[in-house]
Amino acid sequence: MMMPKKVKFRKQQRGRMTGKAWRGSSISFGEFGLKAMECAWITSRQIEAARVAMTRSIKRGGKVWIRLFPDKPITKKPAETRMGKGKGAPEEWVAVIRPGKILFEMEGVDRPTALAAMRLAAHKLSIRTKFVGREDSE
């Protein structure tokens, strides 16, 4: 699973997810992409599940780029613990996603194959997404 090798601070505040993505909103590497249409936290487990679904779908053809990285720690207190006694231990890592962000890119396969693979990946994520081609995003 994806997570940072080293972080300056182990715990972060949760923050807010407002506005649109202004970086990473166009296709840079591949021919086709999967674009987020709403705000969400996507966990490292979801990213890995989507990656596996996509790569198995295209078999050995094509190349896949993952354009998101889970760099935000989410903490959780143990079950049946009383309030107080500090912030919980880091439980999982998430990527903060805003609308317009390209999540995955792909090249080396034809459009119908890429669409089918991206659709499988989209079902593994907890947000609405849209399939885009390089000519669509510019």
UniProtKB/Swiss-Prot annotation:
Keywords: Ribonucleoprotein, Ribosomal protein, RNA-binding, rRNA-binding, tRNA-binding
PROSITE patterns on file: RIBOSOMAL_L16_1 (PS00586), RIBOSOMAL_L16_2 (PS00701)
InterPro entries listed in its UniProt record: Ribosomal_uL16, Ribosomal_uL16_bact-type, Ribosomal_uL16_CS, Ribosomal_uL16_dom, Ribosomal_uL16_sf
GO BP: translation
Molecular function (Gene Ontology), one example: tRNA binding
GO CC term, one of those recorded: cytosolic large ribosomal subunit
Pfam family, one: Ribosomal_L16
Top-rank taxon: Bacteria
Family (UniProt): Belongs to the universal ribosomal protein uL16 family.
Protein function: Binds 23S rRNA and is also seen to make contacts with the A and possibly P site tRNAs.
Quaternary assembly: Part of the 50S ribosomal subunit.
PANTHER family: 50S/60S RIBOSOMAL PROTEIN L16, LARGE RIBOSOMAL SUBUNIT PROTEIN UL16M
Designated name of the protein: Large ribosomal subunit protein uL16
UniProt source species: Solibacter usitatus (strain Ellin6076)
Gene responsible for this protein: rplP
